Curated annotation (Swiss-Prot):
Signal peptide: none annotated. The glycine cleavage system is composed of four proteins: P, T, L and H. The modification N6-(pyridoxal phosphate)lysine is found at K709. GO terms for molecular function: glycine binding; glycine dehydrogenase (decarboxylating) activity; pyridoxal phosphate binding. It comes from Shewanella sediminis (strain HAW-EB3). GO terms for cellular component: cytosol; glycine cleavage complex. CDD domains: GDC-P. The lineage of its organism: Bacteria, Pseudomonadati, Pseudomonadota, Gammaproteobacteria, Alteromonadales. One of its GO terms (biological process) is glycine decarboxylation via glycine cleavage system. This is Glycine dehydrogenase (decarboxylating). The keyword Oxidoreductase applies. It catalyses: N(6)-[(R)-lipoyl]-L-lysyl-[glycine-cleavage complex H protein] + glycine + H(+) = N(6)-[(R)-S(8)-aminomethyldihydrolipoyl]-L-lysyl-[glycine-cleavage complex H protein] + CO2. Belongs to the GcvP family.
Amino acid sequence: MTTETLTQLEQHELFIRRHIGPDSAQQQEMLNFVGAESLEDLTQQIVPESIRLNRDLAVGSACGEAEGMAYIREIADKNKVFKSYIGMGYYGTEVPSVIQRNVLENPGWYTAYTPYQPEIAQGRLEAILNFQQVSMDLTGLDLASASLLDEATAAAEAMALAKRVSKAKKANIFFVADDVFPQTLDVVKTRAECFGFEIVVGPASEAVNYELFGALFQYTNRFGEITDFTELFTELKAKKAVVSVAADIMSLVMLKSPGSMGADVVFGSAQRFGVPMGLGGPHAAFFVTRDAHKRSLPGRIIGVSQDTRGNRALRMAMQTREQHIRREKANSNICTAQVLLANMASFYAVYHGPQGLKIIAERIHRLTDILASGLTAKGVELVNGTWFDTLSLKATDSEAITARAVAAGINLRIDSDGVLGVSLAETTLREDIAELFDVILGEGHGLDVAALDAEIIKAGSSSIPAQLVRTDAILTHPTFNSYHSETEMMRYIKRLENKDLALNHSMISLGSCTMKLNAATEMMPISWPEFGNMHPFCPLDQSEGYTDLIEELSTWLVDITGYDAMCMQANSGASGEYAGLLAIRNYHISRGDAHRNVCLIPQSAHGTNPASAQMAGMKIVVTACDKAGNVDMEDLKAKAAEVAENLSCIMITYPSTHGVYEETVSEICEVIHQHGGQVYLDGANMNAQVGLTTPGSIGADVSHLNLHKTFAIPHGGGGPGMGPIGVKAHLAPFVAGHVVVKHGRESDNNGAVSAAPYGSASILPITWMYIKLLGHQGLRQSTQVALLNANYVMKKLSEHYPVLYTGRNERVAHECIIDLRPLKESSGVTEMDIAKRLNDYGFHAPTMSFPVAGTLMIEPTESESKVELDRFIEAMISIRGEASRVESGEWPADNNPLHNAPHTLADIMDPEFDSRPYSREVAVFPTAAVKLNKFWPTVNRIDDVFGDRNLFCACVPMSEYE
């Protein structure tokens, strides 16, 4: 019989062992190799003593998975899921089970990274290309992005694009129609203030009265009205204004496209295509423009190119527009977007096809017609005379109606002046219409849904003006007309998944990306209706579960970061940067220091840093780094003194982007504070801080957290993400607010940075579960093992590749950089060759050429076992051996396994392969481990230059697949 106690047998800390890859024996073996006695000893060797956290985090102790699920079930049950007719950009939708099970709940889709390595990402690239095709077909425009964060931020991007491309160069006014969604206007105003644009709000028809660089209209508008903008757009374009339209994706199935009216930009939320409301997100926004503006399009674009065999292949196009290359000159700061949700929406369109979508849209519209017919027959006056799915009612007894609605478990939209709104959705049934009659009219109305339907059919009239009915065909590509049975759809999704390498196959060691385990238990609650079916603008007493979860999570994150308050609104890390910089900006303005607009940024910073600073209206001054990769203190002091009068802040990353804990970090903060500035600490590398130190104790004033890195939200192939910001008390009054939802906080009336008050709220349960399950013990140990894994990999590889930077005691933090420049000089083998060759070994490449060109940055995370680390190390050593054969002249520089990587099945089946100076086995089975678990790239190396010179960003003809 065991002598263990009951507490030990209950295994409350079991999840820690599930999350952390190396077991205790493996950890000790690795510690012995790197020269440390224990994790604590290693921590003391690496983390500067002056910043170490000498207490347990106040997040509670670890708990078991079943226990954690019980806790979050109690929280979820506090949410009251009413039938929502609020609309305003958020609607009930049916998530097809085949998509929920095979995409949303499938680690093959949700654990992949942004497709920077396209040869091993052809599946999700095709799904995103489908999303772009849906966007282009429905909007009637030429070129779509791969997704933006939400509809409101897409509106702000449309405004920025309009300013870039408008030929009305002297104009500084952006017009916004007064019937757009209020949250959209709120976000646009926030962005415009930083850019110095003047926002004019008024009736759409008045736009022609101003000298504009751009204008924004809603189609259909917030009250449900459908407007033909053709003449207005013609007038505006004659005045050189760029016209943008916020459009409802479901209505576009039936309505004339904005592009055919003359719109230059069309955007909106794809939420209605099979993505739950989730208290506001995550949802993909579509963004489409004309070909003439392609260089100004924000975000990723998926394009068609060819590989070295001349076969069709997909990849991210025109990356020179983006923040990781153009930095402060980029079109936007977008990095993480909403790819997983865009993929769900694209699969929704594929599954239903054009006819299925038309039936869904027509059913929604018919139910709206029936509701309107019944209400008007009983004397109810409608504000709008046309509609797709939304009615606005002039109600003389709105309080009584609202009371009946609440009693029936129904939420209506309450506008000013006694106007009530009703927006129907895919989830609305005929029984719901009968219930709405009871709520709005009271009992005894005598209306019958079937009879009203028959009358509408007999009358043959329409609430959609004839000239606004869509007449052109949509989604004609075979992809949208082939997979309508569940069997075919399941297999199509699986075929695409098989082309992609995600965490369910092997380690993804991307530096500064933290590709850790996204545990199944953490993921499960996001599929629950108690979290998924909540409207972001529902009454607060209905979302008590969400409120409790967010407040507790905020309390935990405050303690983890050492800050005083959290703002949970930003939808990505880059969005969090922008939100944090806005807090700094508004803090200075409140003190009469509006002139403080200079942001110091080290040359090693992430590309989003200068891009975000530019968006916040700041001027960037770059500071140098020394030979060790640290911030050059003398240069920093000189530049801080030089711009002292106008210094707003500095943006630093900790540990640094060079993968070390800089000893001078607190001194950096002191220098900035001495000159009246604030310190923004980028949270991208927070996985090396949790439980060991805090940004607040270091001396920072504000940080964003990448919940999709440090706190286990999956990357989803390029999103979703969350970037909440932590702030010191003096900045708390200046964080983002929201125009619709008020919480009685000092920041309520501040401008918003996202459409919803809590951003992508429905993925916050993942982070809540992560912290709850690990507890203070697991969080600290996770960070320590992340350090151990990185130092183990670094020391193993240092015998074969030079390590670019180390910190105190020749250690690195949670990531290391290997320098490939000497190898390139001696052999001609490039970092690109090594990255593509790793695909043949079954690995995604580490981060290439950041922060230093010609390097690889490796971040293994705590979730990878010693077995997996050794497999990666073996691959890297084997590749170095292959490079040696090129160095020696045994293999030609232009015909060797690295230069020709990656290799496909077609390669080894090709009889001409025999002419190569290496064998088929060397090409595709270079180690014994690869033979046991082979991943096959489906295309050869892709020609990016060809793709950008021959830009094509739509679904290709089916003949290309043959």
